[in-house]
């Protein structure tokens, strides 16, 4: 009788532990964004843009006239391709293909430009090359020529602003993976290291705060109004995206993989305590008084980087998932409007005060890159499980 009683009690304890475990697991995942709803938000925002720009090759007319393969549009297509990979609609593919063909698969301002902003379009060319089974070498001909010329020059100081990391690093690593030639990985690190350790005197990375100054003009003694260092949200978002993409394509055996991983994880960790209550991050990460408020682009890039890390098992899901959910919920409810217009987007610039003040109905100088950031975020949030 004693043995039966003991066995029964033990079974109840085990059942209770199992139940708690299941409940805990369900609690962790209970608030995951609904996949259909994530796609609906992304599709709504994207359709608004495609309706407004039916001709992907059309020049962009603002204060100046820009060819449509400039960096802002390139970032949009990075997001569109990411969306296509989780929701392969032919219209997305055709839109990206038409854009690439109209620019002859070449860089903005010529094949041998050294400016990462002009080269960013190459990321989509490389993606389309792979999507079609590597059957069209003309799609990567000029990208490869451009990167090869960078390598041949021996120079490594071109990425003097941190936005350039997102525009340029993924091209080197994608080429490295596609061709199997380690020279692209080597050059990528050489240029990254110059930005991190040398630009501005001692580099643009603050190892103490685990955040990045946008360029040398923001390295101390420059301060924000509250006396803190100036860490621009979108600028640090570009670094997050650059590192996520670099980790995706760089072999783990690469001698610099662990450094990329550490920098990526440290940056994400630095973002945790400064997320706003409403889910967004301020444009000035360490000075909420300097145009603090909702801002979509930096927040979307942080969501992209964090969700990517969760999906790849690079960061702790329990720690980061609530942060991602809170931020994505803010984007879905506050940023993407019922008609697809994207609100709270800081215009182009280099610091918190640019493009201010923001508003729910304010149209930024370019409407494309903000959408690209949101589509990148949506593509990784969709994969969460």
Where are these regions (language model features)?
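CBM-like carbohydrate-recognition segments
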Residues: 27-74, 86-102, 106, 110-122, ...
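Extended ligand-binding clefts on enzyme/binding-domain cores
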Residues: 162-163, 173-285, 292-303, 315-349, ...
């Amino acid at each position: 009788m004693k043995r039966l009683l003991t066995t029964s009690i033990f079974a109840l304890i085990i059942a209770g532990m199992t139940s708690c475990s299941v409940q805990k697991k369900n609690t962790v995942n209970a608030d995951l964004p609904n996949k259909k709803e994530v796609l609906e938000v992304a599709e709504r925002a994207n359709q608004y843009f495609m309706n407004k720009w039916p001709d992907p090759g059309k020049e962009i007319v603002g204060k100046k006239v820009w060819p449509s393969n400039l960096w802002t549009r390139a970032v949009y297509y990075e997001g569109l391709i990411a969306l296509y990979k989780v929701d392969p609609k032919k219209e997305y593919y055709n839109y990206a293909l038409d854009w690439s063909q109209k620019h002859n698969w070449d860089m903005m301002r010529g094949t041998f430009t050294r400016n990462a902003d002009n080269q960013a379009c190459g990321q989509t060319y490389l993606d389309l090359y792979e999507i079609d089974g590597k059957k069209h070498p003309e799609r990567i001909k000029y990208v490869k020529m451009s990167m090869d010329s960078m390598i041949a020059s021996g120079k490594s100081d071109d990425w003097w602003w941190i936005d350039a990391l997102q525009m340029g690093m993924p091209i080197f690593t994608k080429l490295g993976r596609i061709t199997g030639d380690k020279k692209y990985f080597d050059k990528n690190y050489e240029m990254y290291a110059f930005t991190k350790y040398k630009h501005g005197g001692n580099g643009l990375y603050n190892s103490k705060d685990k955040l990045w100054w946008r360029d040398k003009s923001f390295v101390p003694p420059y301060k924000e109004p509250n006396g803190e260092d100036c860490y621009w949200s979108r600028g640090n978002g570009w670094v997050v995206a650059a590192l996520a993409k670099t980790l995706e394509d760089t072999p783990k055996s690469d001698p610099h993989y662990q450094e990329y991983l550490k920098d990526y994880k440290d940056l994400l960790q630095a973002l945790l305590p400064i997320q706003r209550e409403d889910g967004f991050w301020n444009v000035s990460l360490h000075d909420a008084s300097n145009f603090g408020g909702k801002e979509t682009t930096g927040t979307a890039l942080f969501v992209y980087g964090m969700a990517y890390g969760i999906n790849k098992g690079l960061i702790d899901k329990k720690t980061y998932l609530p942060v991602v959910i809170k931020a994505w919920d803010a984007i879905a409810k506050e940023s993407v409007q019922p008609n697809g217009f994207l609100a709270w987007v800081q215009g182009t610039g280099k610091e918190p005060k640019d493009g201010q003040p923001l508003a729910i109905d304010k149209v930024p100088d370019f409407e494309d890159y903000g959408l690209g950031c949101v589509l990148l975020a949506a593509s990784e949030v969709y994969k969460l499980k």
